Amino acid sequence: MERIFEGVAGKLRISEPELFVDNESRRRSGHMSHAMVEYEPGRIIAFNSNCSPDRLLGHAAHGWIEYRFSDDYGKTWSEINLLQYSWDEFINGVHTISIEKAVCCNGVITLFAVRNSQYVPICCEPWDTPYYLQSYDNGKTWTEPKELSPYKGRVYDAVVKDNVIYAMEVCNDNFICKEPEHVYRLFCSTDNGKTFEERSVVGLNAVDHAYGSLLFRDDGSLVVYGDNIPNGFELDASVSRDNGYTWEQVPTMHLAKGMRNVQVAKLGNGYVMHGRGSHPDVGSGCGFVFYTSKDGLNWDDGYYLEETKKLCYYSNNLLVREPGQPEKLLVQYSDLYQEGTWRVNVKHLWLSFD
């Protein structure tokens, strides 16, 4: 059933969700890793994790990475492909790999690899330094991985603007930032991802924060968002008007239905935010919530697609522009398939503004 949300930025249409990865039938799970990238018009790669259903009841990144191709703007998908690097790391027994974000710049695809520890039950934190790998042949083959940053942490978002790749890392080997040295850093590449250099430390009070998203607004400014973990109804952000060299923290945003694992995108004449919400009867990190905004800083009261499920709805999005069609946002996310566990399938839905 299609849902319609009368948001502040317009009438947001939310399509009926479609099953993308049927982990239930193969008795697997799919924690983290929802990267998507369009490398040519209409030609998309979508990544997902193939994880143990038993370790931490399916909420552990104990597994490897798969990906599929679409040649028709995300309508149909190829058979599963294995990201060999992730399998090699898995069987080596030290790291597992999560692919949270991917970009394409001038025909070169860059994947950002989070290196999780296999030595803890969640197979996630503590993180090692992040790596990246590339494809020069539309995802058929991949280069050997390179280190993105000397800081242990997790790359939460990456975008491309004017032939520059921007990647944002939360530099902390554990989930929640607790120390002054735990900061959000911006790394940039001007050579299609061959090399990256640190551009700045984002001017954001990172203590008690985690997750994050990047957004270039219509006025050219760059916004970094960070989740306030103790208060699931607050979201902090910092704005740069010089492509990430300097920053100004803006007033804290108060979100009626909360936000965790924030994802923000430009769509049509407005902006969309989605992630896990905060429900007064269940707590933070539950449900799947969508907001709209006219400026990327002031958000409406939001819409719950689902209110109470926990430890799922990790998500990502990809803007798709098909000729003769309105702009659409493809959203990939995890959805609980078995009560009493944290085992998830992976689903797709589409967003568009009337």
In which residue ranges do the predicted regions lie?
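Asp-box/BNR beta-propeller blade signature and adjacent active/binding-site loops
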Residues: 1-354
